[in-house]
A protein has these predicted regions:
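An N-terminal assembly and electron-transfer interface module characteristic of large anaerobic redox
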Residues: 1-238
Length: 238
């Protein structure tokens, strides 16, 4: 109920901006995969493999209203996600889970759009999950790798949501897509200890040889005292 109230409140606040002209706007269009192949035949064909949290118990994501635990890897256009196809059901911890706003404004998607038609041919994104059972992980990663092969891709970017258990989904996808002959880059969510010297991922493989780190979430950051705080400070030291 609390989450539904939050979604309704977000929709209400968003309605206040309807009809306002004092903002910047960008228009994104999306062609079919066949049209993309015809438009840019000489550019490397790239797909974004989009891992979503689906572990249950406040670690869920909803795709068009369906619990992501129950989906198989699915092709979505980025514009669908921009329009709210993915809704977060997570107990969001800073930097580690994606709220709905981040799904709608995914920086990986925006950067791929920026390079589309220039340096790459951004074909589509494959949405997949991060279930807790090994059989589910194997099925989803097998399916994702098969889709990458059928799309005849040159390169794939794989991101993860969360850490620990999802590290396995990240690496499974990477090594299986690489085994299909598709160059793969992973974007990590790392926990390397406060000094940065611990093993940062719970899984690894030699195939994961192109890595973009999301930083060390164990690092302690000291923030300066603010002159004004909106809200309560009671829970800061818990």
């Amino acid at each position: 109920m609390v989450r539904m109230a939050g979604i309704r409140l977000a929709a209400f606040v968003g309605q206040l901006a309807v009809g306002q002209e004092e903002y910047e706007s960008e228009e994104y269009t999306w062609d079919s995969i066949g049209e993309k192949y015809a438009q840019y035949p000489d550019l490397p064909k790239v797909v974004y493999v989009y891992n979503c949290m689906s572990q249950g118990l406040l670690h869920d994501t909803y795709v068009y209203g369906v619990d992501a635990k129950k989906i198989v890897p699915t092709i979505l256009s980025p514009t669908e996600v921009m329009d709210g196809a993915i809704v977060s059901g997570n107990c969001v911890s800073a930097c580690d889970k994606n709220p709905t706003y981040v799904h709608e404004n995914n920086p990986v998607v925006h950067d791929l759009f920026e390079e589309h038609g220039k340096t790459i041919n951004f074909v589509c994104q494959i949405l997949t999950n991060e279930n807790v059972y090994l059989a589910d992980k194997m099925r989803s990663s097998d399916w994702t790798a098969k889709m990458c092969r059928l799309l005849d891709l040159d390169a794939v970017i794989v991101s993860q949501e969360g850490f620990g258990n999802p590290d396995t989904d990240l690496i499974m996808n990477c090594k299986k897509i690489e085994a299909e002959g598709v160059k793969t880059v992973i974007i990590t969510d790392e926990y390397a200890g406060r000094d940065g010297k611990s093993q940062s991922l719970a899984d690894a493989d030699p195939a994961a040889d192109a890595v973009v780190t999301g930083g060390n979430a164990n690092q302690v950051i000291v923030l300066p005292k603010m002159d004004k705080v909106i809200g309560t400070e009671e829970f800061v030291t818990i």
